[in-house]
Amino acid sequence: MSARAYAGLAAAGLAALTVLSPAQAASNATKDEAIAMVKKAVAYIKDQGADKAYPEISSRNGQFIDRDLYIVVYQLDGVVLAHGGNAKFVGKDMKEMKDVDGKLFVKERIELAQKQPSFWQDYKFANPVDKKIEPKQMYCERLENTAVCGGIYKN
């Protein structure tokens, strides 16, 4: 096979992979998967302690990221302690953060966590897979003075 033909086949193969990648990215995470991931994170934090667990939760290559599902840990004052979707949020007070509809979703989340041991919350957020703003449901469990959360995208 000539170098030119080989290059053409390689380019076609690369194009096919690019076209197939979104479809092969697998489906979005489910509610059951979100609950299981949050419970796994809570157990990991209890077992390993925050100093070891939070960096693992925030790691892009860690065990707490699966497709569009990742874990976020908030202090009950709104400060992010760990964030699997964007480590730049760690250490920041996010309680004034609004979604595209103007909802103060972090403030609402920490208020819910102060009242309930676990809950689901609806808001809109950028999907890490396709970067589009989508309806999202976040499942959270209170752990001492924190909320450990993992969410699913509904589209």
Q: What is each of the regions a protein language model found here?
A:
Residues 2-155:
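N-terminal membrane-sensor/transducer module of prokaryotic signaling receptors
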